[in-house]
Amino acid sequence: MNLNQVTLPALDVAASVAFYRGMGFVQIVDSVHYARFQCPAGDATFSVHAVDSAPLQSGVVIYFECEKLDQQVDALEAAGYEFSTRPRDERWLWREARLTDPSGNVLCLYHAGANRKHPPWRMPAP
């Protein structure tokens, strides 16, 4: 199996489209109630779909990997994006920064290098 995409709820699809396009994601599907994006690097996609009310915070965080995290955050801040957490080194060996989209979905921009899939505590292959 391979993960195809993640779909996020959007209170205002047009606002979400502007938000994600402004971050550099490429919109590949457009409709009144739904939009789908491809990540600028790699093959991953995600989408937003219209909802009438914001779901309760579920604890879900969407992670987007950035090769040059600090520069990416600086560029987004210069463009008006507000981060709840500036880039910082975490104990799990990732560098992370967090923000929310217009519907309150939590996003984490991060850089992990080899630790993304191969942290020191990785389980041995079966």
Where are these regions (language model features)?
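Alpha-helical macromolecular-interaction surfaces
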Residues: 15-18, 71
